[in-house]
Amino acid sequence: MKVIYNTLFKRTSTYAVAIIASAFFFERALDVTSVAIFEGINKGKLWKDIKGKYE
């Protein structure tokens, strides 16, 4: 625990960078997960699934 404190939380600048980086990765993971769930629920109804019929 002391190693994490000394590397990330001791200085305000590294603490801010750690927060920004973790927010970025959390947002990406949430976005990818929600898109996968949405596409799984709506499989067969999305444009990418039916556009072959209309081209």
UniProtKB/Swiss-Prot annotation:
SUPFAM superfamilies on file: Subunit X (non-heme 7 kDa protein) of cytochrome bc1 complex (Ubiquinol-cytochrome c reductase)
Task of the protein: Component of the ubiquinol-cytochrome c oxidoreductase, a multisubunit transmembrane complex that is part of the mitochondrial electron transport chain which drives oxidative phosphorylation.
Organism: Drosophila melanogaster (Fruit fly)
Domain of life according to the entry: Eukaryota
Parts of the chain that traverse the membrane: 16-41
Membrane topology: Single-pass membrane protein
Gene behind this protein: ox
Lineage: Eukaryota, Metazoa, Ecdysozoa, Arthropoda, Hexapoda
Gene3D superfamilies: Cytochrome b-c1 complex subunit 9
Mitochondrial matrix side, ranges: 1-15
Chloroplast intermembrane side, ranges: 42-55
Subcellular location field: Mitochondrion inner membrane
Chief localisation class: mitochondrion
UniProt-recorded name of the protein: Cytochrome b-c1 complex subunit 9
Subunit structure: Component of the ubiquinol-cytochrome c oxidoreductase (cytochrome b-c1 complex, complex III, CIII), a multisubunit enzyme composed of 3 respiratory subunits cytochrome b, cytochrome c1 and Rieske protein, 2 core protein subunits, and additional low-molecular weight protein subunits. The complex exists as an obligatory dimer and forms supercomplexes (SCs) in the inner mitochondrial membrane with cytochrome c oxidase (complex IV, CIV).
Record has Cell wall biogenesis/degradation as a keyword: no
A biological-process GO annotation: mitochondrial electron transport, ubiquinol to cytochrome c
Cellular component, GO annotation: mitochondrial inner membrane; respiratory chain complex III
Entry's family note: Belongs to the UQCR10/QCR9 family.
This protein's UniProt keywords: Electron transport, Membrane, Mitochondrion, Mitochondrion inner membrane, Respiratory chain, Transmembrane, Transmembrane helix, Transport
